[in-house]
Amino acid sequence: MKKMKSIIAVVLALVLAFGTVTCAFAAPQSGETEQTMSVAQAVDTLTQSAKEKGDCSDGDCDYSPVIAVPGINHSPTYLYDENDNPVLNKDGKQIGGSLLIIDTDPLVEIILKKLALPLIKMLVTQTDSGFPDAVYDVVSELFSIQSCDKQGNMINNLKTEEYGSLASMDEDTRAWAYRMIPMQKLTNVIGEDHTYFFTFNLVGNPIDSATALHEYIQQVKKETGHDKVSLLNVSLGGTIFTAYIDMYGWDDIDEVVNAVAATDGSDIIADFFTRGAEGFRIEDEFLYHEYIPKIIEESMDSPALGYLINILIRIIPHQVLCDTLTRAMDGIMDTLLVNCPQFWALVPSDKYDELSKKYLSSPEYAELKAKTDRYHEAQLNLRENILEGHAKGVEINSIAGAGLAFGDVEYSYFSIIRSAETVNSDGIIQLSSTTMGATAAAPGEKLPEDYEPVKRGYMSVDGSIDASTAVLPDNTWIFVGQHHEAGNNDVVLTLACAFITDPELKDVHSKPDVWPQYNGTCRTKELRRWLLPDAYAVKEEWAQLSPEDEQPDPADVAELDAAIAQGEEALNMTIADAEKADAATERLTNILVKLGKRSPKEEQSQIITVLEPVLCALSLVALRTIGGNGYSDVVRAVIKGVISHI
């Protein structure tokens, strides 16, 4: 699946607008014993809460129900015909998806029918030959299922799956929900019957989605007997939260946890709407040498193929390539982005006026602009609305990743965005959006020496971030080096759970040794999702052995037990330590490989190892000698020069 993403990213280079740092803060050396005790106490608090949790009905428990308002890839949506009958593909499966809904059955036929002949003509004649327009037609058809009209309404009959509590889900759906948002630490305490999963349409209207959330909240209150709910807003869910509180206020809300939430959009979408050299990094060196290898390396662990593509892509004349990418982008803009209110909700508030004037000034867009204007109003009211909720006693905490450029770590195709050069982000959403106002220098840089924070005591140690400008600086928690895919870091998951379940954790001053305002990054997903479950399964297998069966080597038993303990310790960290997480991952992997439960990691092919620097050098030579020109451009220039001297 990841390789397919890379292929699509290469083919559509500038088109894809969708998804999801090498140093991390280590645990402080001083006060290590006291900190270890504090961490243990924090974990014990969560464990004790889980033990004390019993059946809850009629609102007679300590925890209000939590509603997850999820991200961009978390709301399965399906295509229906005009009679509300499911539309099936040739295999009898309903057409749908949680991100892009594409009917792949006719894809090859469409490409062959519309692209093959123009492509051949273009390559043979080294001229346009209608190829860019053919690409526009294919892209438009590719994304047509989720297209909206100029009023901002979905053209097709799309219905989004709706869910209740995790307890009400079937086993497969519940497992899927946990994969989308790893909430096990939360449900272990408050129960699956008190954890709900709201969904909304990716190409809908955020104002309508906020209304649906309000109705959903009333139903949850009725089911659980509570008079308030808590909201866990994840990524794109932040746009629905922004609209909701502007429309309905705080009467139904107990607590709010914003987890990498897009409360003020993403510069990625703003740059896609901006387009051209102001929106994209289309300089020759980046486009013809750096970009494609970066995408390829993410999924193939080597950029070699990317450098080869750099060399081959010059078969296409420079202007034809530019025109092709432009028309591909036109296809996305015309069928999906411009007409979709939800994507306009991802335009940061300070860029909305300029971009809406650019695209929505025509009278035919009046209805759509009324919808986008209403959401923009909610964006502008966000600070005031948050302060109002805080004054009413609603606990509102924000978790954010920082220190990365767009396209860092994962989803490297976003590195094409111009803002990648200047904006501090989690790789997907800028820090100012996920923190509701924190100030930050560009990735890898520091704030100016003469910078004056609004309030002392909220700067990062390296001087790159100031949380004092956030709406609620005391409730803003920043993980430096953390990518937007925060589910990879169990420290983030534990903190999100603690906000709701630990009554002593009120703000960044409550337990600074356990939960510092500035944390780090680590990758524990493999431990949680695969390695530890596999290790537990081995232990269970051994427990089922009879005395007559061959017994495991005592040394292996001891090593597996030690590796499990080390892995569990890594999952319970409250201060992210990448070295500890990696060491635990490596140790569990090694013993499972030894026991035959996992395959050893494949080493990179010697051919690739040899070819990579060679292809990189050839790509660089081409860049230095002919710049952004195609091969035929150079030939034409040479011929023209020769003729001029005859």
Per-region residue spans from a language model:
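C-terminal cell-surface addressing/anchoring modules of secreted/extracellular proteins
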Residues: 526, 530, 599-646
